């Protein structure tokens, strides 16, 4: 999948100085390229037989929605604070460039539902790790993680549950 790197724009010093942001928007505007990424993910995730895909705000929603639709399974949104109605469960976590909080609706899934967590990019693993813990806290059975892009030098996999499935398609 390295040939798809040319569709990912690098933006220096965004969102903070010293960060090189990987912008995936050029992929989303090219249907053939996006399809080339979605089919392998769809095939891999389908073998795990999840009940839901959980997408992380906000860029994780894009592909998670498409995958949930294609796999005919439910979509769960993991959001930043004060974006979800009703009772929520939350967790604070550290980012590569600061600190943040994620929330999930308290009764969004049946207990022990199999959940595949999806985000567009794996960096330090802080966001994905926090989201995975949140799924467990909400009663879900986290079965794995899937990402479009991984920044391998940041060793984000080390902050994820090593007993679970972890898949990325494009590695930097």
From Swiss-Prot:
Entry-linked InterPro entries: Ade_phspho_trans (IPR005764), PRibTrfase_dom (IPR000836), PRTase-like (IPR029057), UPRTase/APRTase (IPR050054)
Location in or out of the cell: Cytoplasm
Class of enzymatic activity (EC top level): transferase
Provenance organism: Prochlorococcus marinus (strain NATL2A)
NCBIfam families (UniProt xref): apt (TIGR01090), PRK02304.1-5 (NF002636)
Record GO cellular component, one term: cytoplasm
Function comment: Catalyzes a salvage reaction resulting in the formation of AMP, that is energically less costly than de novo synthesis.
Name the UniProt record assigns to this protein: Adenine phosphoribosyltransferase
Assigned keywords, A-Z: Cytoplasm, Glycosyltransferase, Purine salvage, Transferase
Any one Pfam family match given in the protein's UniProt record, by short name: Pribosyltran
Annotated EC: 2.4.2.7
Taxonomic superkingdom: Bacteria
GO terms (BP aspect): adenine salvage; AMP salvage; purine ribonucleoside salvage
